Amino acid sequence: MKVLICRDVSSLKLESGNNGKFDLALKDTKNKVDSSIDSLVNSAIGDIRENGYAIVEGAISSTMASDIKRALAPWLQGKQMGRNDFEGFRTERVYALLDKVPQVASLVEHDVILRIVDAFLPLNYLLSSALAINIYPDETPQRFHMDDGDGAMNVRRPHPPIGMSAIWALDDFTSENGATEIVPGSHKWDHERQPDERESITVTMPLGAVLVFGGNVFHRGGANRTGIPRLAITPQYGPPYMRQLENMTLAVPPTVAAQYSERVQALLGYSVDSPGFRGHVNGRHPRLLVDPHYKGRKYRKDLPSS
């Protein structure tokens, strides 16, 4: 089976003029870029609906990937290996990344990825988890699973994705170093069907690419048969009515969240859901915890893109 690659986003980037504003002469070019990105987003959405996943290459530059990797280095010391076979005894996981590595925010709120997620999740969805996964040499494959809980929520398959996941490659993903394996089309299977290894594909992709898929798709971390670790960042997004995997407003307290954009703050949970005022703090909007001057009520759809 062929891996689906929507497009290399890096070719769609434009350098801005002074003060971040595009020169008038670039307006037509910018319109073409916007149109190309719209096309890419629509293509990715179509691939996810049909096959369960999509890959966007060049979503971040190699320089940005290196910067994030460098900022992560103090937390990647081989001291937080998995506690069981599923987590991986040779896999290092670092949680609460937005409390530790601010650069990760650029992945969490990446506009192209959020536009894809927007098509599948309800308004005001939340960041459920954001972690680094570093697969060390001699790690064995995970069991196949779905991020929607693999039956834990008593929802029979097939069903629409309850959550959406992104896996950002901070190293090249190869067939030998623990690249994610995914089962195309498994989001359409009936409840009893389980994956066979022969039905999966290995998602090989270059540094800077991102795999986006529904929580209703079978996948797993692969075996690392090389001599070096393979690093990825994995943000997961979920509906506003469901408890987050990580308790984000404790993991990223107001004093830390204050440095981020309104968009990231809303994803963390410093936001309310409609209808009503679900998520309030003592009857007040939680954004007041990070911005005492906050005046109005905004939903994430009203916030500017990053």
Language-model regions, residue ranges each:
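Aromatic-acidic/polar surface patches that form glycan- and anion
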Residues: 61, 106, 159, 203-204, ...
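A structural signal for short, well-ordered beta-strand segments
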Residues: 129-132, 166-168, 233-237
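A short, structural micro-pattern
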Residues: 126, 160-162, 227-229
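Conserved double-stranded beta-helix
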Residues: 189-212, 222-306
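Short, charged beta-turn/beta-strand-edge "cap" motif at the junction between a beta-strand
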Residues: 217-219
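Non-heme Fe(II)-dependent double-stranded beta-helix
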Residues: 2-51, 56-155
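Short hydrophobic-aromatic micro-motifs
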Residues: 55-56, 168, 211-213
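Catalytic core of non-heme Fe(II) oxygenases with the double-stranded beta-helix
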Residues: 139-204, 242-252
